[in-house]
């Protein structure tokens, strides 16, 4: 055992420098859902706004001290966002009310504070899930389920964007374009870009019959996810 450890140690020592990564990503998520990481204070008063900002700064200071260099800041949750958007409403975690304006731009603030500390800030966006019926109802007429019913489907008491509908990739690209064009983000991080777990009865039969082009259901669904990634990647690269 000692000999093996010694040999491994020597191998690491003689590996060429070029084998080392040029940039090691040491990333952490800052989760806004239910205020799991942030925020704990509601931004309903000047004092509340200041406290909410201080909470985020404290997290960033701790990450910097722990030698992290990348922050994945939750920018979209489930059909709502943490920046002033012309497409979707503010998440209720900021003020206690869906669509409530916190009086500042959380994403812009997060980017500025990350860059002050020499850290990258990536926009972390939950993509396909839209939340349960209660959550969707709380968003009112600004919910995508009300504005663009064709690309949304209910499944097991929740709503989802339909990956098999061509309009879904267009809608997600619109959101990503809003973020990439309006903010100095260092990257975009997609979450839940997939079908729900154990979803043999996911209601996409109509789209499958229309768009499958001879593929099996499983292959068609896999291709739908790949196409969304491909489409948005190309769109972002065309911008930056």
Residue ranges of model-derived segments:
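Polysaccharide-binding and catalytic clefts of secreted carbohydrate-active enzymes
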Residues: 68-69, 105-108, 117, 140-240
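Catalytic domains of carbohydrate-active enzymes, especially glycoside hydrolases
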Residues: 51-80, 182-185
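Aromatic-lined carbohydrate-binding/catalytic grooves of carbohydrate-active enzymes
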Residues: 66-102
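Aromatic- and glycine-enriched glycan-recognition loops and surfaces
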Residues: 45-66, 93-117, 223-234
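Bacterial N-terminal signal peptides
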Residues: 4-13
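Active-site-adjacent "subsite" loops/lids of carbohydrate-active enzymes
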Residues: 23, 31-54, 112, 122-182
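Boundary at the C-terminal end of the N-terminal hydrophobic targeting segment
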Residues: 17-21
């Amino acid at each position: 055992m000692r000999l093996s450890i010694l040999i491994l140690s020597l191998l690491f020592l003689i590996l060429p420098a070029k084998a080392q990564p040029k940039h090691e990503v040491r990333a952490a998520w800052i989760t806004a859902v239910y205020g799991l990481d942030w925020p704990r204070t509601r931004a309903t008063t000047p004092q509340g706004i200041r406290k909410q900002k201080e909470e985020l700064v404290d997290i960033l200071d701790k990450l910097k001290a722990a030698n992290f260099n990348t922050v994945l800041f939750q920018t979209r949750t489930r059909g709502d966002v943490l920046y002033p958007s012309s497409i979707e409403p503010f998440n209720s975690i900021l003020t206690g009310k869906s669509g409530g304006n916190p009086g500042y731009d959380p994403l812009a603030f997060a980017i500025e504070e990350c860059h002050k500390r020499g850290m990258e800030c990536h926009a972390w966006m939950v993509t396909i899930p839209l939340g349960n019926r209660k959550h969707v109802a709380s968003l009112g007429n600004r919910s995508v389920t009300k504005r663009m019913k064709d690309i949304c489907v209910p499944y097991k008491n929740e709503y989802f964007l339909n990956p098999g509908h061509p309009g879904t990739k267009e809608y997600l690209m619109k959101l990503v374009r809003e973020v990439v064009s309006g903010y100095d983000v260092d990257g975009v991080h997609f979450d839940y870009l997939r079908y729900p777990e154990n979803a043999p009865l996911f209601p996409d039969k109509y789209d499958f019959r229309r768009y499958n082009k001879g593929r099996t259901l499983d292959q068609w669904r896999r291709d739908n996810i790949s196409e969304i990634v491909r489409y948005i990647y190309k769109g972002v690269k065309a911008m930056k």
